[in-house]
A protein has these predicted regions:
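Alpha-helical scaffold segments in soluble metabolic enzymes
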Residues: 4-9, 35, 61, 65, ...
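Short amphipathic alpha-helical segments
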Residues: 34-37, 59-60, 90-91
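Helical hairpin unit composed of two closely spaced alpha helices linked by a short loop
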Residues: 40-80, 84-85
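Glycine- and other small-residue-rich loops at beta-strand/loop junctions that grip anionic moieties
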Residues: 25, 48, 95
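Switch II (G3) loop of P-loop NTPases
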Residues: 1, 5-35
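C-terminal lobe/tail of nucleotide-utilizing enzymes
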Residues: 67-169
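Short coil/turn connectors at secondary-structure junctions
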Residues: 16-19, 41-44, 73-74, 110-112
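Conserved active-site and cofactor/substrate-binding residues in soluble primary-metabolism enzymes
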Residues: 1-4, 31, 40, 54-57, ...
């Protein structure tokens, strides 16, 4: 049912010309992921994890699925969400509430890029509730999201250049 809705969402919407289309999928390797890989020419996947060990199992399955020859979707990198918390009244203190280093460990183990470690930050939820993206702002959290966006945009630009170069040769 979800795969059918995704197929309809992708194929029936009048998207127009897009620079980027980001899809936030549930963790794992289910029908949704495979359907998407079959119906859309994907530039790449960003694997999002959290620091907990239990999250690593899903991430490992996702990495393996995207690397299957019949799927073969490049992995742009890993983002570790909820990496740490910095209290407003103690800006020099970091708390690793859910553990530490899972994103780095996975990136190293699978020779992937660790794109970002996103903090637990109440202002992100507050901004979202008012319709303001987390990337907007002048604080370190906004800068982290801006850096992530720029890294992904650079990766996609390089990939697109490679595709054009291969077509011209």
């Amino acid at each position: 049912m979800v795969s059918s809705a995704l197929r309809q969402f992708i194929t029936d919407a009048a998207w127009g010309e897009l620079d980027y289309l980001l899809l936030d999928l549930p963790p794992g390797t289910g029908d949704v992921h495979l359907t998407l890989a079959q119906i859309v020419p994907l530039t790449g996947a960003i694997i999002v994890t959290t620091p907990q060990d239990v999250a690593k199992a899903d991430v490992i399955k996702s990495i393996a699925m995207f690397q299957l020859p019949q799927v073969n979707i490049p992995i742009i990198g890993i983002v570790e969400n909820m990496s740490y918390f910095i209290p407003a009244d103690m800006p020099n203190k970091k708390y690793y509430i859910f553990g530490q280093g899972a994103g780095e460990q996975l990136a190293k183990e699978y020779q992937l890029t660790l794109l970002a470690q996103l903090p637990i930050e109440p202002s992100v939820a507050q901004r979202s509730d008012t319709g303001v993206p987390a990337v907007m702002g002048n604080d370190s959290v906004a800068q982290t999201y801006q850096d992530l966006a720029q890294t992904v945009a650079r990766y996609i630009a390089i990939k697109n250049e490679q595709v054009l170069s291969n077509k011209n040769n």
